[in-house]
Amino acid sequence: MLSAFISSLRTVDLRRKILFTLGIVILYRVGAALPSPGVNFPNVQQCIKEASAGEAGQIYSLINLFSGGALLKLTVFAVGVMPYITASIIVQLLTVVIPRFEELRKEGQAGQSKMTQYTRYLAIALAILQATSIVALAANGGLLQGCSLDIIADQSIFTLVVIVLVMTGGAALVMWMGELITERGIGNGMSLLIFVGIAARIPAEGQSILESRGGVVFTAVCAAALIIIVGVVFVEQGQRRIPVQYAKRMVGRRMYGGTSTYLPLKVNQAGVIPVIFASSLIYIPHLITQLIRSGSGVVGNSWWDKFVGTYLSDPSNLVYIGIYFGLIIFFTYFYVSITFNPDERADEMKKFGGFIPGIRPGRPTADYLRYVLSRITLPGSIYLGVIAVLPNLFLQIGAGGTVQNLPFGGTAVLIMIGVGLDTVKQIESQLMQRNYEGFLK
């Protein structure tokens, strides 16, 4: 491990990528700690302490999960990666509905660039909407309930517009930084920024668990997190290897092919994307309800307000757990269906003279791949759902339903381990290309 790390730093190109990624991460954390103009930061800090200790503490922890604590502090990067994630969900859903998007997806790199451009435009529009909602909630006292202090001292139109523009610009900058990491650094940029935001909150949340619940609960939570980490690493490395044989063929005077290889199908083919999508989607009803309440100035008594307040504001509630679990299952199947097309894989294999032993090329191969993929996706989706909701159940039973520290939850652990493994594998492939021994044995 140490020798591989030293080798990665000795390689000029790889060292440049690692240092570039670290530089972007540092800038991201600086922006996440920099208050927006017009925000009374000491009052914000005091309100966060009061709100986190109240009944809404759990949903506040969930909201802060993807921003590293920046959202509730109303910093420059308060909106963070959420607009881009939401835009990605919408664009990928539209590929099933709009034929033009489906055609772009099949056009390769050029089509993907166009889809990315549409995602950026939609992300900026969503950033404006989300920043406006956050500022409106903060101005009306609905963002941090139970706090009477003024978060925004000067509530003139000019000040509010400036804060919205700053947060929107921050979201655009975060999106650009994530794409820079993907293009010039190591790992997936957006996923890595989410990873950094979660990791930044672990020390403070660990101290909070230790002080509020004592050493026994803290040890139990750490042990549960360790067990989850081991299980996640084990499953993430698991794959079904489908043997592929390539027939010999003559090209000029040379013989090509005749080799045997395999097509790896991971148990968790979708990665952490379904968890990120489900986590970002499940808090939207709460945010919309808070915005409506702050706009009307009264607490709603409709069935929707009661449903959101009772079930969707408490991550340890059984209804919340069931909806969250169902969303993960849905997004797992949906994302796998988009990223892995059995028909395209079968056509590619047939084009280059490849076939699965015992299976005819073409349609039978596609049907076989679809059958195997469906059998793998079911346990993979259940695995993601169970790991994500297991700490919710554990803390509900063991801690009497008190506030959940989400950086130690299954969602955060899944994202951190998934992103960490993906980043290590990218460094591993870079080292192996240069004939160095990698991290993974």
UniProtKB/Swiss-Prot annotation:
Swiss-Prot/TrEMBL keywords: Cell membrane, Membrane, Protein transport, Translocation, Transmembrane, Transmembrane helix, Transport
Key word NAD present: no
Entry's localization field: Cell membrane
Top-level taxonomic group: Bacteria
Transmembrane stretches, start-end: 18-38, 78-98, 124-144, 157-177, 180-200, 215-235, 272-292, 318-338, 382-402, 403-423
Calcium listed as a keyword: no
Gene Ontology BP term (one): SRP-dependent cotranslational protein targeting to membrane, translocation
Membrane topology annotation: Multi-pass membrane protein
Gene Ontology terms for molecular function: protein transmembrane transporter activity; signal sequence binding
InterPro entries: SecY, SecY/SEC61-alpha, SecY_CS, SecY_dom_sf
GO CC terms in record: cell envelope Sec protein transport complex; extracellular region; plasma membrane
Principal place of residence: membrane
Function per UniProt: The central subunit of the protein translocation channel SecYEG. Consists of two halves formed by TMs 1-5 and 6-10. These two domains form a lateral gate at the front which open onto the bilayer between TMs 2 and 7, and are clamped together by SecE at the back. The channel is closed by both a pore ring composed of hydrophobic SecY resides and a short helix (helix 2A) on the extracellular side of the membrane which forms a plug. The plug probably moves laterally to allow the channel to open. The ring and the pore may move independently.
Other facts: Was identified as a high-confidence drug target.
Subunit structure comment from the entry: Component of the Sec protein translocase complex. Heterotrimer consisting of SecY, SecE and SecG subunits. The heterotrimers can form oligomers, although 1 heterotrimer is thought to be able to translocate proteins. Interacts with the ribosome. Interacts with SecDF, and other proteins may be involved. Interacts with SecA.
Recorded family membership: Belongs to the SecY/SEC61-alpha family.
Official protein name in the record: Protein translocase subunit SecY
Source organism: Mycobacterium tuberculosis (strain ATCC 25618 / H37Rv)
